[in-house]
Amino acid sequence: MGVYLRLLVACQVLVNLAGVVWERYRVVLLASVMLPLAAVAVDLLDRLGVLEGEALALTPSSPWGIITSAVVHGGFYHLYGNLQSFSFATMLVLAAFMLSTVLIDDSRSAARTHVRAFTAALVLSQALPALRLYVEAVASGAHVVAYGLSQVVFGLMGLLASTCAALAPLAALTAVEERVEVPRLPRAVLIASSSLLISSLMLLAVGFQEFLEALGMGMPTANVRGHVEAFVVGLVVGAAALGWGYSRARLTLAKLRRLSSSLGVEEARRRVIMKISRMP
């Protein structure tokens, strides 16, 4: 009975955590499902001849492709590779968000900041590089056809880098503010600029050549410039959004020290015992 009760409590804790994640990060979760579904639907309709995929791609005559080109792909392997990368990037970003909420005192406020940063990075990492490409194509008269979800993927990787890097200046400010209070605006600027600096140092540690190869350098069909721009957009947007959102937050280890309480184990145990007591 003891082992059975522990298993039931563990399951209840997981259910409770899933509820909290859904409540706070439903936008992230919905985007991680809806974008791949839209890409698969467009590819299927294109194969069936119902919809011509190029009609949604970015060309000089289709400015709506600045947004819609993200769900258009050039065949199964292009679609599969981008969906795999997008799912992996989204999971990494969500994991970084959840780790951050554990280490930040006001986890609800942190979650709202994360959702805003994710939404901005998702939209702008697709729109800004595509807008630059569209303007250049119209100005030069060149025929350009661009499509794919890869810019969003690299935008999310930039957001991931800034999310991880922002914890370091937040920890430093938390230590400093035990003695002196730092105003909100300088605090936000310090967090944002420090996260950009740390992310840049991380890239140098990895190696700039290796970074460019990861962005597709050497592949004839890869839009390396767009990938770089998307990564930078995600990095900067993430740093700015997190800097302002964390401007009143403090780092804490209290939740880790009271892990059982943070996970709601006792509440889960009470719920399980109540359910068992109602069973005939």
Located regions from the model:
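Membrane-interface micro-motifs in multi-pass membrane enzymes
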Residues: 142-166, 226
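Topogenic membrane-insertion module of multi-pass membrane proteins
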Residues: 1-43, 47-48
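Internal alpha-helical transmembrane segments of multi-pass membrane proteins
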Residues: 110-118, 122, 145-148, 152, ...
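Membrane-interfacial alpha-helical segments at the cytosolic side of multi-pass membrane proteins
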Residues: 82-105, 156-173, 232-250
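Alpha-helical transmembrane segments in multi-pass membrane proteins
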Residues: 120-129, 155, 230, 234, ...
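C-terminal transmembrane module of polytopic alpha-helical membrane proteins
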Residues: 1-21, 71, 175-280
